[in-house]
Every structure is written in structure tokens, then in C-alpha cells.
Amino acid sequence: MRRAALILAFVLFIGLSSATVTSADSITYNSGTSEFFDGDVFAIEVTADQSTDEIDIYLGASELSEKTDGEVNQDLSIEFTHQDSKLKYSTSTSDELRDIVTLTTYYEDGFDTEQDAIDAIKSDCYDLNQNGNGSGRYSRYYSVTSPVYDYEIYCFQKNEKLATPAYIDNPDEIFTAKAELQAGDKTIQSATLSNGDAGDGTVTDLGDSKISWNGNLDLGASEPENSRVIALYSNDFENGWRIGNKQSYEDYKTFIGGGDAYDLLIDWQDGTYTASEVEDELVNTDANQAVEEASSSTTDLVNAKVKDSSLDTGSFVYDTPELLSYPSFTVYVDAGENGYIEVTKPTGDPDIISTSSTEIKEGDEGTVTATVENVGDGEGEFSGRLSSCGEGFSIVDDQNTKNVGAGESVTYSFDVAFSSVSSESKEISGSCTFEVNGVESSDSTSVSVTGIQQSECNPGDQRREKNENDRWEIYTCQDNGLTYEYDVTCAEDEKAVAQGDNQFSCEKQDDDSGGGDNTGSDSGLFSNLFGGSGSGDLLTQVHTALSILAGLVAGFFGYRGARWIHGETDIKGGFKLESRNVSRVKRGSPVAGIVGAVLGFVVGYGVASVFHPVVQIIVVLGIAVGLYYFR
């Protein structure tokens, strides 16, 4: 079964209302592959012109089946529910911001010199303008107890740190939505999506499925104002942080560093205010107001919750209405016969309808074929191969894949090699197993092969060799021509003597009577005639003599014939054969005659030597009679 991929493409546009998306606007089917799955593709496009708090799409199996050449076996539902949207506001501390503290008045006298008073202000007093020199007043007075002038100082010291201020950064959108996909009654595939999972170009896992985003999933609500508030950190605050009024902090900062607090030191020094009046009623009023929590009339951020309570990474989260603005996105769902969405398509069914065998010569290759018909209802991709062959046969080409339409046939061809494995039979019969596999079914059969072994000898021919005891043994070629079989071992005083035509016999011989190691027939042109082999066999000598005689006779005719032909070509005239009174032989060249004689002898001897002596005698008599009558 060909696999397919189901692509669900949703195009959702931002709007103002919050209607639930429930249907698809168009369904198209494209044959091909998707980015994540092999196979065909469903594209289901949905367009919604509003932000929404829910997507609930239902597609029936019949609706999907209409768009493909197969059958979809389950309904499909896609839901985006349980949306939760927030804004995250991070905090940033800065050297531009000063801690909010309460102050206490500080007075000391008895300094001997002016410089002693200045040094005491630098070391012991709170630095109002943060320039590193301290802030305070000093004056000279006459000491009654000692008749000298001493110095006194008036300043503030830090009493308690109320809070550390920090800027509130612009918000990051944080939202989640639970996505669920289910085909029929199969296990639900789900994922919880957030803005980190739904950015432009991001691919999100939805169980075994995928969601590819073509834009950013955004909040469907406005952001609360953050420019009129400031974050305040203190261990005394619940969860460490609170939202303060930025203007109250600026008023405190201006009062402390802008000169108002220093003016109170002057008023205290000249007696306008007492120390307790300055400390309890005047200098700490702005500090206490600066650390108060902002009101809801200033910003909706007062309803934000602390997300991170640490000083360095503090942050707030603000819940927004549960609306999301969806971009276009695509859901990829594995489909096919074994996919999450089951799609059944007509498939091919292979059936082997014929095979052809082959004969293979030893060391060569032959070709076997098998014809396969697709008896299924759909196109099939069939993989044909030779899986195994019998002993002595080896597979050269083992696999081939072909696409076959319904009702069509295709032929597979494979080369098979053969090498000799037996000395018992000239022909080796065997078989190879041919298999063809489709997606859902397969077929197999045996294809016969025959190996033809090369002949090692001519049946009936003999050869001889000495054994380990230095005695002659005679071997005879078997009827199948594949091997020599042991015949006989000659006696110690015998030798294996050639008898002609590759035959041998054990004969008693003198030490110098031949019978060497030659494994052939020992029937040379003159050795057989004059006993060079020491055989003394009369029949062999007669056979050789008649062969020579035949060669001489043929040489005679070759000599005369060659001179006659040469003489004929030398005659002048209109029609040469009319000059019967001219001797062509005498006119011909002797050199041509010699050449003809040699050729005639070789041909005559060669032809005669292959016949039995009886046949040779009959032929010689026939030639003699012919010479007598036609000379």
C-alpha cells in the first residue's frame, strides 16, 4: 500500500470577534510528498476573519474520501482549546535609580579643627547627592569648658532601606493553547502550544504529527500601560516585588538629591526645626510615599502577579482575556494503510504467468526470464529477484523493480552463471527460485536451468601413466567425456604401447623398444611405419603405409592437375578449350606441379589416416581401377 500524508492547512486572520472556528472552506488533494512524510497529500484550508478562543473542526471520512482515489477510514477532528494568555514584564535594575531609604538626624561636636569636622561628614553622614563627599553642615563655637573654639556637625544617617527600585520592561507575550488531533477512535495526539512553539517558521510536534507555522501566534488583547509605574523590591514585600507609582519615586529622588533634604539641615542648624521635627515629620515623608503600591487608576498592572521573586531576574505576569490571533499554519498527519489516518487504495497483486529456462555452457552465462501479470485493481510496484540457485549455478543479477499497471504484464530477465561441479554427468540440471513482491502480496516459482560441462577427453580414448611403483597404468575416457577411468596396470616386464587412435595395450618389450611417457597414440608419420615406437603391430604399419600411399597418389594427381591448370591459363586464343591438340600438362610450370604435389600429398595422407585400414584398402583399389581406365 502506498503511504500518504495528510496535510491540514489552516489560514486564520486576526479580527475583532471571538467566534469558534468549526469548518473548512476548501479541501484539495495533491499527489506527491510532504516535507515530513512520504506519500500523497491532503490540503485542508480554513479561513477565519476573527481572533478566537477556540478552534473545533470536524471532517468526515466520506468528505475526505471524495478528494482522493482511495478510501479514508476515519473521521478527523482538530481542536484548539484551553487557551491561557499572559503578558510577562521583566525588571531591570540601574545605577540611575537610588535605593529608597529613611533617614535619621545626626549631631556631633568637639572637633578640634575644621578639617576634622569635614572628614567626619564624609565618613559618618549619608551622601544626599551621591557625589562621594558626604552631605552635612558644620559650624564653629566657643567651648566654655576649655577656652578654645571647637567645631560641630549636622547631617543625616541612613536609618532603613525601604526598597530597591527597578524599571519595568516592555512585555513579552506568554500564552498556551492545547491542540488535540484525533482520527476516529484512535489515541488522541496532543500538544500544549506556547508562543515559543508557534513562531514564524517554527515546527511543533503534535504527537507523531507536525504543525508548521507561517506567522506568529499573537494575543488578541491590548497591553496594560507600564510607563507610569516602577518595580520595587524588598524582602519585606510579599513575594519580594510590588508595583509602585513612578511619579512618587521621582518625587522622592528629587527631594533627596535636589536640595530639599539639605535645606532641612540648614533649618535644623539655625533652630527653625528641632531634630525630632525634621526626622519624624519632614525628611521621610517622600520615602514612605514612594514605596506605596500604585493604585488601579494608575495602571492595570497593579493586578499583575509576581512570577520571579529574585532581585536580579524579577518579573511579573499579567493575565489577559483568553483570545488568540492565529496565523496560517499547516498540520501534517501521517496517513496510509498503516498511518494514523488510514487511507486504503487499490493495489497491485503480482502473479507469475510464465518462465523460460536456459542452457549454460561451463564458464559462461545464460539468461532466465519470468513474466508477471498485475491481477490487482491498482498499479503495483513489484520487486522481482532470484533468491537462490542450485549447486554450480550463481546469480549475476539478483533484483529488479518495475511499476506495473492493473492488468498489465512485465518480464524480468536475470543472468545466471555456471561452473562445473560434477564428473558424473555431461549435463547438470538445476533450478533457481524467482520471487516477486508487491506491497501486500507476493508470488514465487522455480525456473529450470541446465549446465553443459566441457569435455575433458573423447569417449574411448586412452592414456597411460606410471604409478608410484614405476609400472604402467592405462586409463580410458568415460562415455560422458568428463574424466579418465582406470583400466589396467601392466606387469613389471610390460610397457603400455600405443596401438593407434589413442589406444594402448600392455606388451612385453626390450629395454630399447620404445613405450616412452607419451600419453598420445604414438602414430607419427614415419615412426609407425618403421617401428620407431617399437610396437611391431602389423595392422598399425599397414594403416600408416596405406595412408602414405594415398598421399603419394594424391600428390601425383596434384602435380598433374596443377600443371594442367597452369598450362590452360597460358594458352592464347578466343576459346581456350578448342585447342585440344595442345598438352596443358607439358605447357604448365613444374613449380606449379610441385606445389600441387605437396598439397595433394598432405591432403591425401591426412584424409586417409582417419579411416580404418579396411576402408583404406577399398579406396586404394578404387583409385587404381580409376587410373587404369582414365589414365
UniProtKB/Swiss-Prot annotation:
Keywords: Calcium, Cell membrane, Disulfide bond, Membrane, Metal-binding, Signal, Transmembrane, Transmembrane helix. Residues 225-316 are annotated as: Domain II C-terminus. Residues 91-170 are annotated as: Domain II N-terminus. Residues 456-509 are annotated as: Domain IV, required for fusogenic activity. Residues 143-148 are annotated as: Fusion loop, required for fusogenic activity, not required for membrane surface localization. One of its GO terms (biological process) is plasma membrane fusion. Monomer in solution, crystallizes as a trimer in high salt (2.5 M NaCl, 0.2 M CaCl(2)). The trimer is stabilized by interdomain contacts and numerous Ca(2+) and Na(+) ions. Exhibits fusogenic activity. Mediates cell-cell fusion in mammalian cells when present in both cells (bilateral fusion). Belongs to the HAP2/GCS1 family. Fusexin 1 subfamily. The extracellular N-terminus has 4 domains; the first 3 are structurally similar to fusogens from plants, C.elegans and viruses, while the fourth domain is unique to archaea. Domains I and II are discontinuous, domain IV cannot be replaced. The protein can be anchored to the membrane by either a different transmembrane helix or by a GPI-anchored construct and still directs membrane fusion. The fusion loop in domain II is stabilized by a Ca(2+) ion so that it protrudes from the molecule. This is Fusexin 1. It comes from Uncultured archaeon.
